Amino acid sequence: MSLRKIIHIDMDAFYASVELREQPHLKGRPVVVAWEGARSVICAASYEARQFGLHSAMSVATVKRLCPQAVYVPPHFDLYRQVSAQIHAVFRRYTDLIEPLSLDEAYLDVTRNFKNIPYAGEVAKEIRAAIFAETGLTASAGIAPNKFLAKIASDWRKPNGQFVLPPHKVMAFLETLPLGKIPGAGKVTLKKMQSLGMRTAGDLRRFERGELLNHFGRYGYRLYDLARGTDEHPVKAERERLQISTEITLPEDLPLGQAAGHLPHLAEDLWRQITRKNVEAQSVTLKLKTYDFRIITRTLTYSSVLPDCAALLQAAQMLMARVPPQTEDAFRLIGIGVGRLVPKNQQQDLWA
């Protein structure tokens, strides 16, 4: 078992919490972050809203049925990025091995941290306290020997808590861990696991690698390792990007049509980034991740730059139409990105 000290930091209901910080009169009410419209999906739900069964990626139509009193707040992605930058500034006081997963979560390798604190749990406690002091927002943390276990642990004491999983307790922890807690184990995978008599990671561990490959394809390799608490993937420090992108991990696996409901707000977010960086783009890429971690990408390249957000959304929707609507596929992530970047005004303002 690795002796690394990995922290997974996950902000609590991040988008909704930022909005509640800005509009404190809404505290205690079921708040959802979304553009109000019958065809929209929500970006986030406050903990009060979650008590009604609301969650991100749910359609506004469903929200209205489950919680007619929900308060709708439009998303402010520039503000979320600003707050995320504050949070990352806190991380950098302790380590430069930071792997962002999104605006509101990241892995940190604190095995050798700048403050020479021997206990990763103390590092996590200090980081969470600093985040709260500087942003007014709470974070949860999981501390473990690898990324897989740290991510599971961060969900254990949510919200505003942390859970330390030391190496000598990993096997006992996994023995009773519900399979639904395994990252990437969506509805399709879980249904197959249950049909094989699996209920916990301990049950999964009793299957040989070949059996798992037979039942789950190449995802079986990953399952075999995860059932034994093994994950050698390093924390990858953020590198300068050659493209600009935005994506969302869905709280549950969704069919293609429902996943496509996220394209409008993803396009809005991405266009804000393009505008802020003062660049223009000539290619658009759609990214989808299936329940079994297969990556599907589609790309369009134009002879001139994208003129506006509507053109970006249209391109993303065209790419979505190129994905075969395989009914057995469920998607757990959707994202769009732009490439072939040039400084603004360098290209002719034409749309091909």
UniProtKB/Swiss-Prot annotation:
Any one GO BP annotation for this protein: SOS response
Subcellular location: Cytoplasm
Family annotation (Pfam families): IMS (PF00817), IMS_C (PF11799), IMS_HHH_1 (PF21999)
Coiled-coil annotated residue ranges, if any: none
Reactions it catalyzes: DNA(n) + a 2'-deoxyribonucleoside 5'-triphosphate = DNA(n+1) + diphosphate
Keyword Transferase: yes
Entries under SUPFAM superfamilies matching the protein: DNA/RNA polymerases, Lesion bypass DNA polymerase (Y-family), little finger domain
GO CC terms, sorted: cytosol
Active-site residue list: E105
CDD domains recorded: PolY_Pol_IV_kappa
Cofactor(s) demanded: Mg(2+)
EC number per UniProt: 2.7.7.7
Signal sequence, renumbered to the chain: none
Binding site for Mg(2+): D10, D104
Enzyme class: transferase
InterPro entries attached to this UniProt entry: DNA/RNA_pol_sf, DNA_pol_Y-fam_lit_finger_sf, DNA_pol_Y-fam_little_finger, DNA_polymerase-Y, DNApol_IV, IMS_HHH_1, Rev_trsase/Diguanyl_cyclase, UmuC
A Gene Ontology molecular function term of the record: magnesium ion binding
Family stated for the protein in its record: Belongs to the DNA polymerase type-Y family.
PANTHER family: DNA POLYMERASE KAPPA, DNA REPAIR POLYMERASE UMUC / TRANSFERASE FAMILY MEMBER
Function statement: Poorly processive, error-prone DNA polymerase involved in untargeted mutagenesis. Copies undamaged DNA at stalled replication forks, which arise in vivo from mismatched or misaligned primer ends. These misaligned primers can be extended by PolIV. Exhibits no 3'-5' exonuclease (proofreading) activity. May be involved in translesional synthesis, in conjunction with the beta clamp from PolIII.
Subunit organization: Monomer.
Protein's recorded name: DNA polymerase IV
Gene behind this protein: dinB
